[in-house]
């Protein structure tokens, strides 16, 4: 039998193997490059719109931050992204559908939640519905001894305008921004190249989100949190 060089783990990613660490890394580069070339060839001349509409009003962004903070149980920082990449994603005709399929890789769920918030014309109604849907998701898949995490979104799509990310501090916000950037870039490519993609189902994602070892990562981060994080103070 030929020696196995790599393995595709469905709905997760790719692994490469070798007794030598450097050669294992080189195999990773080789296989990922092969995939990138295939995707590029499949996309061909297909393009999606990067046009930018007027940005959301500052008062709307402030309202979004306020309501998300209330559901989160702490003041959150928010970042609005209307870069070409963010607008290209927000302009997808089926953005609500593609954004609501799940994370690209399951372990992202502890940072980004299973799906983002998609904001419609009624801001409060959109955010409240997201939170209520999360509570239903928890009740559907949880067992009695589990404690629900907060139901607030970690990122949001403003159709036609851009992307919002949320975090209780700069570190969390940066992590979410980084994950979302790679997520939307990959979704755009898979939509253009293959006409779609599929995430792990909700029940499996719930198991990962509430898996003890994954929760330990968040608890460790929370133990180092500061008492006034996310707050603004005026010193006179």
Residue ranges of each PLM-predicted region?
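Functional cores that coordinate and move charged inorganic groups
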Residues: 1-40, 45
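Structural motif
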Residues: 13-14, 162-163, 232
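Domain-length cofactor-binding catalytic modules of enzymes
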Residues: 26-226
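Conserved N-terminal Rossmann-fold NAD(P)-binding element of oxidoreductases
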Residues: 229, 233-236
């Amino acid at each position: 039998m030929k020696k196995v060089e790599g393995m595709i783990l469905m709905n997760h990613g790719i692994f490469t193997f070798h007794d030598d660490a450097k050669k294992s890394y080189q195999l990773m580069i080789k296989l990922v490059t092969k995939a990138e070339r295939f995707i590029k060839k499949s996309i061909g001349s297909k393009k999606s719109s990067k046009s930018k509409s007027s940005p959301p009003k500052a008062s709307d962004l402030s309202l979004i931050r306020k309501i998300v903070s209330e559901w989160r149980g702490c003041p959150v920082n928010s970042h609005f992204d209307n870069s070409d990449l963010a607008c290209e994603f927000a302009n997808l005709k089926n953005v609500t559908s593609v954004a609501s399929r799940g994370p690209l890789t399951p372990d992202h769920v502890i940072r980004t939640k299973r799906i983002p918030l998609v904001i419609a014309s009624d801001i409060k109604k959109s955010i409240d519905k997201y939170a209520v849907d999360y509570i239903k998701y928890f009740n559907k898949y949880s067992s009695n001894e589990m404690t629900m995490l907060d139901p607030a979104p970690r990122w949001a799509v403003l159709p036609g305008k851009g992307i919002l990310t949320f975090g209780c501090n700069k570190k969390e916000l940066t992590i979410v921004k980084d994950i979302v950037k790679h997520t939307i870039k990959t979704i755009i490519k898979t939509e253009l190249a293959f006409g779609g993609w599929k995430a792990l189902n909700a029940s499996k994602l719930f198991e990962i989100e509430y898996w003890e070892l994954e929760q330990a990562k968040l608890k460790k981060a929370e133990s180092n949190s500061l008492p006034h994080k996310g707050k603004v103070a005026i010193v006179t």
